[in-house]
């Protein structure tokens, strides 16, 4: 919606370096049609979600490094339950979507026409919620903070702002 990228849907990276290069060159990482998540990728996604760096020796040198630092939102798509390790699950919002009934199906061209018609409304609603969450954040209280406490506070502030903005 706000980060157009020629490779907006990517396949599973072969190594962490590929993931971090993608993160350096875009604001949203979208991995499409995954069958499962290998342990090394789960760990790398955790670092990327909360902020981390990747260092590798610079080509044609003995002692120089290239360091890539990034903190990015990530979308994962697959048929099976993808996140199985607790550290990744604690950083995730899991959505299990129903199968689209036959009578509700449409072509991709039709979908995008309908989406473009409401795009300004969607973006406006999202910005209203973010603006409200920024106002609410300092007053948010959670009785028992979970492991990802800052995210929980932000999500709660967004939820409160959404209710106050009457965005559906």
Feature locations, PLM:
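Feature primarily recognizes SF3-like P-loop helicase cores of small DNA viruses
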Residues: 3-42, 53-77, 81-168
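Conserved catalytic core of Hanks-type protein kinase domains
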Residues: 48
């Amino acid at each position: 919606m706000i980060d157009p990228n020629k490779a907006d849907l990517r396949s599973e990276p072969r190594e962490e370096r590929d993931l971090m290069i993608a993160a350096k060159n875009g604001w949203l990482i979208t991995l499409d049609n995954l069958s499962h998540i290998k342990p090394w990728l789960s760990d790398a996604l955790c670092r990327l979600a909360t902020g981390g760096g990747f260092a590798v020796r610079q080509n044609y040198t003995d002692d120089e490094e290239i360091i890539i630092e990034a903190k990015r939102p990530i979308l994962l798509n697959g048929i099976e339950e993808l996140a199985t390790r607790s550290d990744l699950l604690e950083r995730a919002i899991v959505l299990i979507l129903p199968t689209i009934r036959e009578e509700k199906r449409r072509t991709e061209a039709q979908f995008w026409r309908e989406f473009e018609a409401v795009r300004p409304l969607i973006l406006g609603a999202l910005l209203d919620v973010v603006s409200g969450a920024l106002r609410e954040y300092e007053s948010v209280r959670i009785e028992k903070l979970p492991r990802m406490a800052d995210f929980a506070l932000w999500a709660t502030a967004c939820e409160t702002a959404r209710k106050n903005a009457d965005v559906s």
